């Protein structure tokens, strides 16, 4: 039986389409591509901290490798909490309103990322910054890449929609590594035999991605649902 039969939901005209036609429908849906782009930017910031956070804490903030690794360890743990919270926050607290939790999580991730990147703070404050950022980005990803994507396509097309979003996310994660590595290497100079890092350009790249990741779906949500 279909999901609609099990739940008592009404069938839409798209639900009756063959699978191949539904896949074409998803690929032609501009809303899915907006979500895919937004999700890609989420992955840029998410994997930037995972991949480059230890180096950043060592070279920019002067932490020993042991403490830098511990701080990023808190980042990984907090992301699990954010993922668990996302559905409850959107459906129970905000009553299935996708925009408000997206703005909340997006702003929180943007602010805490900026504080992490641009403030000279100690061990505990950096733990707080990366933990809150990771929690917020976990919520943001689940709402944008999951709930929003599911909301705008027929039930039978959710697999195709999530596939498009997932592929774009992982492609962006790979491109992020290449771009971030280039920006870090290009802005590193050698002084008296010691590498001096300038993380400014790559930090602005990460922060811009964090802003676009939630602004894009929020501004286009009404259009995507039509």
Predicted regions and their residues:
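Extracytoplasmic gate region of multi-pass secondary transporters
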Residues: 29-86, 141, 146, 175-180
């Amino acid at each position: 039986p279909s999901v609609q039969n099990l739940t008592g939901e009404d069938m839409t005209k798209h639900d009756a389409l063959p699978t191949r036609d539904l896949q074409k429908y998803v690929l032609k849906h501009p809303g899915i591509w907006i979500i895919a782009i937004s999700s890609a930017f989420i992955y840029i910031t998410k994997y930037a901290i995972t991949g480059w956070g230890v180096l950043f804490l060592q070279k920019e903030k002067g932490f020993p490798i042991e403490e830098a690794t511990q701080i990023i360890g808190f980042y990984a743990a907090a992301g699990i909490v954010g993922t668990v919270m996302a559905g409850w926050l959107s459906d129970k607290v905000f009553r299935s309103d996708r925009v408000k939790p997206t703005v909340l999580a997006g702003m929180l991730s943007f602010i805490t990322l900026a504080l992490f990147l641009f403030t000279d703070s100690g061990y505990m404050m950096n733990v707080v910054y990366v933990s809150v950022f990771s929690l917020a980005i976990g919520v943001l990803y689940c709402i944008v890449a999951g709930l929003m994507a599911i909301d705008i396509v027929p039930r039978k097309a959710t697999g195709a929609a999530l596939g498009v979003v997932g592929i774009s996310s992982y492609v962006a994660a790979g491109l992020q590594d290449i771009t971030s590595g280039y920006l870090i290497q290009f802005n590193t100079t050698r002084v008296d035999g010691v590498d001096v890092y300038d993380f400014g350009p790559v930090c602005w790249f990460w922060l811009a991605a964090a802003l676009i990741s939630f602004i894009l779906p929020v501004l286009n949500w009404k259009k995507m649902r039509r």
